[in-house]
Amino acid sequence: MPMKLEGSCQCGSVEFALESSTPVPYQLCACSICRKVGGYSGSVNLGGIADSLKIKKGKDLIKKYSAVMARGTPDEKICASERNFCSNCSTMLWLWDHHWPELIHPFASAIDTELPVPDEMVCLMESSKPAWVRWPEGKKQVYDVYPEDSLEDWHKKHNLFFE
């Protein structure tokens, strides 16, 4: 059975709930987009079941942002994904992409439910990380870009997939 996740923004104006089969916060992304919108070291995204999302409070305060990839280069383009955030306090809530409409990716930082603790972290986008950003201490795997395993693949390999 999927795990029920409850989340909110920092100011408390937005509250939401959803179900997740992939709730372990093991993957830290340090790409420039995640660092700019998520803070110093980047963001940790979870996997969620999109049609289970219930906005309990503050729907009118949720705004969307589509990030700019390769900003300032000839390859610059707008991402297809939408980052949903609270327009009062700027808390990043979840990411959704029309290429995978059945999925939603809540930011672990917005989740109030106690999450399972990973035995190790997967740190990705080393190639985008400035030298002054430090990976967390402890057991970890570091990738220059995205690893081959999806969130679902990783959870299943580690017997942490919530069916």
Where are each of the predicted segments found?
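A short Gly-Trp-Pro
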Residues: 1-6, 13-163
